[in-house]
UniProtKB/Swiss-Prot annotation:
This protein's UniProt keywords: Eukaryotic host gene expression shutoff by virus, Host cytoplasm, Host gene expression shutoff by virus, Host mRNA suppression by virus, Host nucleus, Host-virus interaction, Inhibition of host innate immune response by virus, Inhibition of host interferon signaling pathway by virus, Inhibition of host PKR by virus, Inhibition of host pre-mRNA processing by virus, Inhibition of host RIG-I by virus, Inhibition of host RLR pathway by virus, Interferon antiviral system evasion, RNA-binding, Ubl conjugation, Viral immunoevasion
This protein's record includes keyword RNA-binding: yes
Protein name: Non-structural protein 1
Keyword Acetylation: no
Family stated for the protein in its record: Belongs to the influenza A viruses NS1 family.
GO molecular function terms attached to this record: protein serine/threonine kinase inhibitor activity; RNA binding
Motif Nuclear localization signal: positions: 34-38
Modification after translation: Upon interferon induction, ISGylated via host HERC5; this results in the impairment of NS1 interaction with RNA targets due to its inability to form homodimers and to interact with host EIF2AK2/PKR.
Region (RNA-binding and homodimerization) residue spans: 1-73
Cellular component GO terms, alphabetical: host cell cytoplasm; host cell nucleus
Amino acid sequence: MDSNTVSSFQVDCFLWHIRKRFADQELGDAPFLDRLRRDQKSLRGRGSTLGLDIETATRAGKQIVERILEEESDEALKMTIASVPASRYLTDMTLEEMSRDWFMLMPKQKMAGSLCIRMDQAIMDKNIILKANFSVIFDRLETLILLRAFTEEGAIVGEISPLPSLPGHTDEDVKNAIGVIIGGLEWNDNTVRVSETLQRFA
């Protein structure tokens, strides 16, 4: 196993632990908490794939980070922050809409890269809107957090979500996945539209 893969996982585990401590003090906003939940699933998937214990990896990650901080000057930190482009977090859905459980009468599931597409084929003759929470950088979709399909009544009838065990996807993956879910829902004579925010970037 590549040593960089292991050390990267260890550092990610420790940084997630710090962010969790921050959230436990009720200091995180909605985008922060969304990323925290998503990254927890990703770390579990990576840990399982690598065969590494998360608690042990967190301790090792702490040692790596402490060593880096000992060598870090304030001036170097300012330069690093200034050189990193900032991403924007855009939200169509509330936390309640993102976390709500939903069920399918006739489930269908497909994959587009590392994205999982799920939809209920029992839904017919409905007006449906696709809403998503995602981040944008350089005016391009960077990371899809979650996309869901809602009827006018507010029922969830479809979803696109990243697989925790396969981190990383492109904006093309997202566009392909959206095409799949639209095609699948329109097959049953549903009318599907995409939110204005999502239209601009996907």
